[in-house]
Curated annotation (Swiss-Prot):
Propeptide feature: residues: 19-57
Physiological role: Antimicrobial peptide with a broad-spectrum antimicrobial activity. Shows very strong bactericidal activity against B.megaterium (MBC=0.1 uM), E.coli (MBC=0.2 uM), S.aureus (MBC=0.4 uM), methicillin-resistant S.aureus (MRSA) (MBC=0.4-0.8 uM), vancomycin-resistant enterococci (VRE) (E.faecalis (MBC=1.6 uM), and E.faecium (MBC=0.4-0.8 uM)), and extended-spectrum beta-lactamase (ESBL)-producing enterobacteriaceae strains (K.pneumoniae (MBC=0.4-0.8 uM), E.coli (MBC=0.2-0.4 uM)).
Signal sequence, start to end: 1-18
Protein's UniProt keywords contain ATP-binding: no
Tissue expression from the record: Expressed in entodermal epithelium along the body column.
Keyword Membrane found: yes
Assigned keywords, A-Z: Amidation, Antibiotic, Antimicrobial, Immunity, Innate immunity, Membrane, Secreted, Signal, Target cell membrane, Target membrane
Entry-annotated residues carrying Valine amide: V85
Protein's cellular compartments: Secreted; Target cell membrane
Protein name, per record: Arminin 1a
Amino acid sequence: MKTVLAFLFLPFIAFTHAESYEDVKEEIKNEAEKEIFEDLEEESDALDSSVREFNDAKPWRFRRAIRRVRWRKVAPYIPFVVKTVGKK
């Protein structure tokens, strides 16, 4: 939506402030490129943050495995494991 409004509003601004047709074309082209690059930067920032999350999984694999354990299902067996290990 932002890009559509820019394309509708920018020619009006360009025609009111430009000296010639070539200046109008150049100004519209520059503004359109600027909008496109801003949109691409926003999208790349979102993609970079999600890529970091996926790449973080390797160093923390053991930690994530511990987090995935269903502690409510495992908790009843903890006293048995402690007794067994303590008998050595």
